[in-house]
Amino acid sequence: MCGRFTLTVDPAEFQDKFGNFTFPKNFAPRFNIAPTQPVLGVPNNDRFKADFFMWGLVPMWAKDPSVGNRLINARGETVAEKPSFRGSLKYKRCLIFADGFYEWKAQPGKKSKIPFYIHMKDRKPFAFAGLWDTWNSSDGSLIRSCALITTEPNELMAMIRRMPVILHPRDYAKWLEPSAQTPDQVSPMIDPLSRRGNGCVPGQHAGQQSVYRCSELVVPAK
């Protein structure tokens, strides 16, 4: 499960990294993005324009938007079968941008867990494989929401737990294909990223409480 991530890169550098997409001109660095908060993503609507989604998928048929609190992650192994996710996998896929994420490792015999901050070795931003949907309330308001797809861990993450699917740049266009896609067409992209691209360091506090939002969260623990 992925329950916290970061997006701290300068907007100008971000635009250089993802030149095929259009982004908001300004967005503040965020060191502890938590469920129900807005996240930056690009939907597969053929416009290649980034916008903000609420993290926690609310299917269009949901009776209450609070269901999104429980639908922050979709397991890659079962995403094509689960009613909450299978429609979005077929019709509504998105990229969710980040430059790192947090995970916690249990310590034998202890209640406390060791926090880890996982990022690319070059500290560059990347894109998670996401699903999105829209939900209309009775008063006409609209909620656009998303979930991150998770997968089995690579060698680096195996010592901790599962990991979110980080898409290879060559797969961005295929993932954002606006037409309907079958599970067989998208499943090859739902794989753990090679360890060669990841770095992993113990973090300070590591964002287990969403009120922590300072840069100290991503400083390696001493």
Question: What name fits each language-model region?
Answer:
Residues 1-222:
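Short linear sequence motif anchored by a di-proline
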